[in-house]
Design a protein with these regions (language model features):
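Cyclic-nucleotide recognition modules
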Residues: 46-103, 107
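Regulatory nucleotide-sensing modules
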Residues: 1-39
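Phosphate-/nucleic-acid-contacting segments
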Residues: 119-155
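Short helix-to-loop capping/linker segments positioned immediately adjacent to catalytic or ligand/cofactor-binding
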Residues: 16, 87-88, 110-113
């Protein structure tokens, strides 16, 4: 990571933050893509040019709930400090309440996606340990897992 003023550059595949890290800022992507994953590696979404990520934990003042990785190319972003986000929403209590509720729903949705993926993984492992010929069911469950991994739910 290279930082100058409020501009940050991450190299391809560089870890931006991990689950459990403290949250003092959000980021506005200027160039490149950032991928967001659950703690167990389920892809939740991809954030690109003109989009913000990291705002949920920053607004809610919690540790990071997802892992953020730079994409295939360099990522350029502008850092948005916590106090700037707070100032933006402080002036409008209705907007602040809407944002907070939306962020809580997003966290819940991310957890549900991870739970579903974990359930499917468990079923696949059980099927793989059996000597029964149930390839069709197994292939179908693998397809569901791939679809879940490609869902576009953004933090």
């Amino acid at each position: 990571m290279k930082e100058k003023n409020n501009q940050i550059i991450w190299e391809p595949q560089e870890l931006i933050y991990d689950v459990g890290d403290s949250s003092n800022e959000a980021f506005l992507v200027i160039q490149g893509f950032v991928y967001l994953y659950t703690q167990n590696g389920l892809l939740l979404g991809r954030v690109g040019e003109g989009e913000v990520f990291g705002e949920t934990s920053c607004i809610l003042q919690t540790n990071r709930s997802v892992k953020a990785l730079a994409g295939e190319h360099q990522v350029l972003a502008t850092k948005i400090p916590h106090f700037s986000l707070k100032r933006m929403v402080r002036g409008d209590k209705a907007l602040s309440a809407i944002l907070r509720k939306t962020q809580l729903r997003l966290i819940d949705s991310n957890k549900q996606s991870q739970d579903l993926a974990s359930d499917l993984d468990s079923i696949l492992k059980k099927l793989e340990n059996k000597s029964l010929n149930i390839n069709n069911i197994q292939d179908h469950l693998k397809l569901i897992r791939k679809k879940l991994a490609s869902m576009q739910i953004i933090d």
